[in-house]
Regions:
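Helix-loop element at the rim of GNAT/NAT acetyltransferase active sites that forms part
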Residues: 32, 40-56
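Acetyl-CoA-dependent GNAT
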Residues: 55-113, 117, 121
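Short catalytic-loop micro-motif centered on adjacent basic/acidic residues
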Residues: 53, 148-151
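Terminal substrate-recognition subdomain of acyl/acetyltransferases
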Residues: 1-24, 118, 122, 152-226
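A generic structural signal for beta-strand entry/edge sites
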Residues: 111-113, 148, 175-179
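A short beta-loop-alpha structural element at the N-terminal edge
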Residues: 25-37
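Conserved acetyl-CoA-binding loop-helix of GNAT-fold acetyltransferases
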Residues: 120, 126-141, 148, 162-166
Length: 226
């Protein structure tokens, strides 16, 4: 029993030490089975964070409705899980006809554009999670034949403004709000391979955490019974 316990202890993925460089950020595409944890993530945002993410302080009922209405077949949602299976960051990539977004309508000849929104839990700030989510969204757009990535946020949203400036997005400010968009290069074999590898690594990481967690619970129950 001690041998099994020790093996699981070595296998378990430990919580990161302080410092963003200590934490491997794995961005995983989310699906229907993640909806409950998505709801927990958004309900965990305080009023100021909800204001920055949604442009208004949504009450719990509207946050719940937003999560319930997420369409995984139409849009793409990315997330970063910690070792306790809590979503630390979520990126929502919504696709729309270019006519639906007048601010970028003339910036592309493609039929669709993409709008990106991101939220990061307070305890996970400073780890580069928002940037990683944006980078994954950008490469996904390229591989989906979308060449214009758009963000709308409050000018006071330091996370999104930092991402916009760092990525070289064109930014227009007006009345405390900001519109930013980035022109993307076409897809290449390299971008397709990169996204596939990143998703596979994230899935392996998720599976390892899930199996380790299940085995640890099983061992704990077995110990109680013996």
């Amino acid at each position: 029993m001690n041998l099994l316990s020790n093996a699981l202890s070595r296998l378990a993925v430990r919580e990161p030490e302080e410092g963003p460089e200590k934490f491997p950020v794995r961005v995983k595409a989310l699906a229907e089975r993640d909806r409950r944890r998505l709801l927990m993530h958004f309900l965990g945002l305080n009023e100021s964070d909800r204001l920055l993410r949604f442009g208004t302080v949504l009450p719990d009922e509207l946050v719940t409705r937003y999560v319930q209405m997420l369409n995984f077949a139409r849009d793409t949602v990315f997330g970063v899980y910690d070792n306790r299976f809590k979503l630390m960051g979520v990126g929502h990539l919504a696709f729309a006809p270019r006519e639906a977004l007048p601010v970028v309508r003339d910036a592309t000849t493609k039929e669709r554009v993409a709008e990106f929104g991101v939220s990061v839990s307070a305890e996970a700030r400073g780890m580069g999670i928002g940037t990683k989510l944006f980078q994954r969204a950008a490469i996904h757009c390229r591989n989906a034949d979308v060449d214009t990535l758009y963000m709308h946020c409050l000018s006071s949203n330091r996370t999104m403004m930092h991402i916009a400036k760092k990525s070289g997005m064109a930014i227009e400010r007006s009345y405390g709000e900001a519109d930013a968009y980035l022109k993307l290069d076409p897809a290449s074999p390299g971008t397709v391979m990169r996204e596939a590898v990143e998703e596979q690594v994230a899935m392996l990481d998720y599976t390892l955490k899930a199996n380790t967690r299940a085995a640890t619970k099983w061992l704990a129950n077995l110990t109680k019974e013996s």
